[in-house]
Amino acid sequence: MKTLIVAALFCTIGMALADDTPPPPPFLAGAPQDVVKAFFELLKKDETKTDPEIEKDLDAWVDTLGGDYKAKFETFKKEMKAKEAELAKAHEEAVAKMTPEAKKADAELSKIAEDDSLNGIQKAQKIQAIYKTLPQSVKDELEKGIGPAVPQ
């Protein structure tokens, strides 16, 4: 679920900068444009909230939609949990191959990303602050092993 929230927030930020509309999440495929727009507006409004607060707001919002949106959303959440488990396993495998310095940096960055007391903006700021202090070799290793740690 956190993956959805983070991805949707980056899409929303990108959408605001590029004035493009990102595709809707799978549970809103085929939904009227006003419903999709309301989804992205909710995320934009919630950008200063923590992940648990956003999840609560999303659950409440989906409940208001009626129809089969609730069932699609529940299926989507289950799929996201499975995807998160796959990503966590791949992350563990990548980290196992890293140098001690990169492992330490990854642990610091992961701790921030998983901190439910921080909102997305706070997480991004803290991650960027740490990332800027890392030696280039560690940044390269992190990006090679797990992808960019800081949104470009």
From Swiss-Prot:
Q: Where is this region: IgG4-binding?
A: 49-68, 118-137
Q: Where are the transmembrane segments?
A: none
The record's subcellular location field reads: Secreted
What does the record note on temperature and activity?
Answer: Resistant to heat.
The terms describing its cellular component in GO are: extracellular space
Its Gene Ontology molecular function terms?
A: IgE binding; IgG binding
Tissue expression as described in the entry:
Excretory gland, ventriculus, and the luminal epithelium of the intestine of the larvae.
Region labeled IgE-binding and IgG4-binding — which residues?
127-146
Alphabetically sorted, this entry's keywords are:
Allergen, IgE-binding protein, IgG-binding protein, Secreted, Signal
Q: Segment Necessary for IgE-binding: which positions?
A: 25-42, 49-54, 58-66, 103-120
Which residues belong to the signal peptide in this entry?
1-18
Kindly give the Pfam families that the UniProt entry links to this protein.
ANIS5_cation-bd
Q: Which superkingdom is the protein from?
A: Eukaryota
Xref: PANTHER family:
DUF148 DOMAIN-CONTAINING PROTEIN-RELATED, PRION-LIKE- Q/N-RICH -DOMAIN-BEARING PROTEIN PROTEIN
Q: Which family does it belong to?
A: Belongs to the SXP/RAL-2 family.
Q: How does it assemble?
A: Monomer.
Name it.
SXP/RAL-2 family protein Ani s 5
